[in-house]
Amino acid sequence: MPHSYPALSAEQKKELSDIALRIVAPGKGILAADESVGSMAKRLSQIGVENTEENRRLYRQVLFSADDRVKKCIGGVIFFHETLYQKDDNGVPFIRTILDKGIVVGIKVDKGVVPLAGTDGETTTQGLDGLSERCAQYKKDGADFAKWRCVLKISERTPSALAILENANVLARYASICQQNGIVPIVEPEILPDGDHDLKRCQYVTEKVLAAVYKALSDHHVYLEGTLLKPNMVTPGHACPIKYTPEEIAMATVTALRRTVPPAVPGVTFLSGGQSEEEASFNLNAINRCPLPRPWALTFSYGRALQASALNAWRGQRDNAEAATEEFIKRAEVNGLAAQGKYEGSGEDGGAAAQSLYIANHAY
């Protein structure tokens, strides 16, 4: 086997590892506020608000104006390109607001999913062209981590070996390019919850996908201590008739991770995948109470599951902004507890927190 030339210096490795550990410090997770313009259209239309740049700015301001209470439960915020260069009402750049709280800034760098020819409707993710230059610029502008999402779906014939291999390689290329530019890559191979498959089938597919991802990361000489993983929890398909407990979901999820994710990885930041706010918190809590040894931090990287109640409270009205921000802080604190296995539940069976946030065939 030929010698592998060191891709990163000791200093570069230390910087990447330190950033990753800051993001997933105990009780901390990630706010995913990186919805594209198209995704924001869906969010805003739900509350009857027009999808303009100004309305998107006002909504992001609701989230980013949260006070210092979020410092103990939010370790990182993922921005969308547009948001990275927007300012609050006082002319302070959003990125400065987040950095001043001691929270790490991240950026979504993929350019969306595209069809993978020769498959049954499967996809790969585009955005590698010019990625190195974009990462260098984002690093200068204050971002220290990035996110790239690949999507796989479960059916009788999918995910195919081709889709698994292609997406694993794309994630590895992205991760390698990020690290060369001092940016911690969050690797996101999302297996969609669409379908009627049971828990066992999701666990099997999750194991196969994660095994392929870590093989690719190894092939591309990616420094695992300077990465984070953003996977789906192992859950049944949305149309599955069987209902599973949070404990069953936790056991299946932790088992799949233990079989595939090296202990060198500092943290696993779960996506919420259309679960309701409460469901996402209960499941994360159960995962952190799972009786199996867990060498990584197991925390959250939630979008809708941190924002749904805030969005509902805001409804595009300036007068509601403060109340909406409070709703966001409440969810952030709950998930900070769940990330430590300390969440006892709010007793809220109704309201926005219990609403399913599922969107079929979810594309950002």
Curated annotation (Swiss-Prot):
The UniProt catalytic activity note for this protein reads: beta-D-fructose 1,6-bisphosphate = D-glyceraldehyde 3-phosphate + dihydroxyacetone phosphate
Q: What is its EC number?
A: 4.1.2.13
Q: In which pathway does it act?
A: Carbohydrate degradation; glycolysis; D-glyceraldehyde 3-phosphate and glycerone phosphate from D-glucose: step 4/4
Q: Where is this site: Necessary for preference for fructose 1,6-bisphosphate over fructose 1-phosphate?
A: 364
Provide the positions where the record notes the PTM N6-acetyllysine: 111
Catalytic residues of the enzyme: 188, 230
Gene it is expressed from:
ALDOC
Q: Which residues carry this modification: Phosphotyrosine?
A: 5
PTM sites of type Phosphoserine: 36, 39, 45, 132
Single Gene Ontology BP annotation = glycolytic process
Misc. remarks from the entry: In vertebrates, three forms of this ubiquitous glycolytic enzyme are found, aldolase A in muscle, aldolase B in liver and aldolase C in brain.
Q: What is the annotated quaternary arrangement, including any partners?
A: Homotetramer. Interacts with ATP6V1E1.
Q: Which family does it belong to?
A: Belongs to the class I fructose-bisphosphate aldolase family.
Q: Does the keyword NADP apply?
A: no
Keywords assigned by UniProt, alphabetized: Acetylation, Glycolysis, Lyase, Phosphoprotein, Schiff base
User: Has UniProt tagged this entry with the keyword Lyase?
Assistant: yes
Record protein name field: Fructose-bisphosphate aldolase C
Which InterPro entries does this UniProt record tie to the protein? Aldolase_I_AS, Aldolase_TIM, FBA_I
Q: Name one Pfam family in it.
A: Glycolytic
